[in-house]
Regions:
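Residues at helix C-cap/C′ positions in short coil/turn segments immediately following an alpha-helix
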Residues: 28, 38, 120, 149-151
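Amphipathic alpha-helical effector-binding/dimerization core
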Residues: 5-94
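Short amphipathic alpha-helical interaction patches enriched in hydrophobic/aromatic residues
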Residues: 4-8, 100, 161, 186
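Sensor-regulatory modules in signal-transduction proteins
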Residues: 142-145
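Juxtadomain coupling helices with adjacent low-complexity linkers
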Residues: 122, 133-134, 151-186
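Short, basic/aromatic recognition patches
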Residues: 16-24, 93-139, 177, 185
């Protein structure tokens, strides 16, 4: 397992987030995670368990601490990338090509940058089948006390079980509230 400077500099985040994530899961009935950006990937540093999954400590959709996925393919990566300064994002795009995970993955740099601009304007990110077919990802940013995005808070749902509207209605406000709590604690 790789340990990054990004993780080491935010090592207190998992301890702070963990009990809040469990409370959020109790409220929404869904699993949630906190991720940080590590080069071209996001890494899960804290995740919640539903009561039904608690016994086996197995989470749906491959969500577990240490899990890594390409940042540009998932809502939790896009929410972090959306808050990068333009020059920083351009450098990131030069180093990390937008490879395709599914037929819905955005691979055009200009389209991707516009999508990130829209995400930043709305303050949340929805990714439907971009990382994996049949999955909806939904994320909000986690800011530190100085106003810098340090992580993403997300949930993932199977599109056979939930519509986009159901995910949004169930999760948007509670996730935004939890992100505000974390900001005050960071």
């Amino acid at each position: 397992l790789k340990f990054s400077g990004a993780y080491l500099s935010s090592a207190h985040l998992p301890k702070i987030a963990q009990p809040l994530l469990h409370s959020l899961s109790s409220q929404t009935g869904m699993c949630h995670s906190v991720v940080i950006l590590d080069n071209h990937e996001v890494i899960t540093v804290a995740c919640s368990y539903l009561a039904s999954a608690e016994k086996n400590r197995v989470l749906p959709y491959g969500i577990h601490n240490g899990n890594r996925i390409a940042a540009h393919t998932a809502s939790n990566g896009k929410i972090i990338l959306a808050y990068m300064q333009d020059q920083e994002l351009d450098t990131w795009l030069e180093h990390y090509p937008l490879t395709r995970s599914t037929k819905y993955t955005v691979t055009c740099g200009q389209t991707f940058k516009q999508q990130l601009h829209d995400i930043r304007d709305q303050g949340w990110c929805l990714a439907v089948e971009e990382h994996e077919v049949s999955f909806i990802g939904f994320s909000v940013p986690i800011f530190d006390g100085s106003g810098r995005v340090v992580a993403g808070l997300n949930t993932v749902a199977r599109s056979e079980q939930y519509t986009v509207e159901q995910v949004m209605n169930r999760c948007l406000v509670p996730m935004q509230e939890l992100a505000k709590q974390l900001r005050m604690l960071l």
